[in-house]
Amino acid sequence: MDYLIAYDLGTGGNKASLYDADGACLAEVFIAYPTTYPRAGWHEQRPEDWWQAVVQSTHLLLQQAAVRPAEIVAIGISGHSLGVVPLDRHGGLLRDSTPIWSDARAAEQARAFFSRAPETDWYLATGCGFPPPLYSAFKIMWYRDHEPEMYARIAHVIGTKDYINYRLTGTITTDFSYASGSGVYDLLAWRYNPDLLEASGLPAAIFPEIVPSTQVIGALTPDAAAILGLAAHTRVVSGGVDNSCMALGARNIREGRVYNAQGSSSWIAVTSAKPLLDARIRPFVFTHVMPGLFNSAFGAFSTGISFRWVRDNLCRDLVEQAAREGGDVYDLMTELAEKSPPGARGLIFHPNMGGGSSLAPSIHLRGAFLNLDLGHDRSDLLRAVMEGVAMEQRLVLDALRALDPGIGRELLMVGGGSRSRLWRQIYADTYNTTILKTSVDQQAAALGAAACAAVGAGLWRDFERIDQIHIIQDRSDPDPGRSRIYEQILAVYRQAAIDLSNLGDRILALACPGRET
């Protein structure tokens, strides 16, 4: 038998999954790693933590599965985007902890860049619809301006999954989907843009060679094979950025298909032969891992991670209870949230704890509970968070529908948030759209990475098998009464985004003790 391993390097940790040649997931293991926040707007992770999570999860996966290492023929990786891992000419890591996709430290570098290159032209060429400081090129410019000695030693700057690919094979490359988040990649030309590189002042040589997501970039080095417990002949394909791997795993293998991803961050994406670009509301676009296609999306940065923040700060007793009982703390949290009625008794939560998206009036928009009073209890707080996360994504869905009116009234939901029956119903009622859950929920990005490996290794001729793997397990239809409640709340939520953005801009200027700006 032939088997595949997929690594899904998410914001919260790495999930290793074992697939058979038909695309069935036989086993999976998750290893968490931390994000640190050294200053306001700085979000960092340690590349060594990613590697150790890959090593540990591989060992546990092999222990779970009754397969021989020699039967694993290929590996594919999905990785969170906009990474900037600096390597010297020997491949050595130059920074122990590196900015991740949500890190916004490079605002000054973005402003300097746009004094040389018009921002609208840059967006229309790149499709980079996140706030500009998040994109890789500006973070590299920050390295240059703030850590010149380290910057002078840089030979390559690569992303999350490409760093793991390098540790696996010794080869430094990227794929089209990950390169499309560099900030200097031209979507329609399918290459780095020389004019944007010139405006950045960055040497083209530090950006990795771009290859297809299904291309075999090498076999495991003897050292990597020994550390992982795998055979040295195991091939590694380039893989892709999480957005695009998830699109593939979520059945977006044809034009017009849409999915909603629920994780630490969330997004709604449509697949098309041409990128959906709008200079005013700026959807973000990544090249698909499938040749000739694009994924255009709007996202919400702090959705699932807001729920995790509530878990860590307001539900420590539930964490302990789940540990004692061998249960899932999120199940306990949603059971408690269900005791609060729709609308959380007038309590509204804004989940933008990591900053505003391109749809927000300001990147300095931050999270808030609104209308909190002494009559509210923890069940209201929890339900308000779940509803606020759904409200934020309703804004996303409305913006996408304005660009593509053909988006239908059924939506496939994938990712960790799709597991909760209550949350799926809240989404259905808030979106006024039917939510579908299939047999592939949290496995979508991993399935996409595995599919890249399957095609690259010659086990699959193409990606058509993806449709056969999905089996519909649940359908949540909107309730008209609850939808009317949420429509009323949505009007307040929209206004609150404006007001909170203004407050965020003002608070940024405050010299608060213990708060870095």
Language model: regions and residue ranges:
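Active-site core segments that coordinate phosphate-bearing ligands/cofactors
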Residues: 5-6, 107, 114-130, 134-173, ...
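N-terminal glycine/serine-rich phosphate-binding loop of ATP-dependent small-molecule kinases
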Residues: 1-96, 153, 222-226, 230-235, ...
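Residue-level signal for inorganic ion chemistry
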Residues: 23, 46, 75, 103, ...
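Short, solvent-exposed cationic patches
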Residues: 46-53, 111, 117-120
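Active-site donor-binding loop signature of nucleotide-sugar glycosyltransferases
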Residues: 31-33, 212, 478
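A generic structural motif
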Residues: 32, 100-101, 301
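Short beta-strand-loop/turn "lid" adjacent to the catalytic site in phosphate-handling enzymes
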Residues: 63-101, 126-136, 165-186, 209-212, ...
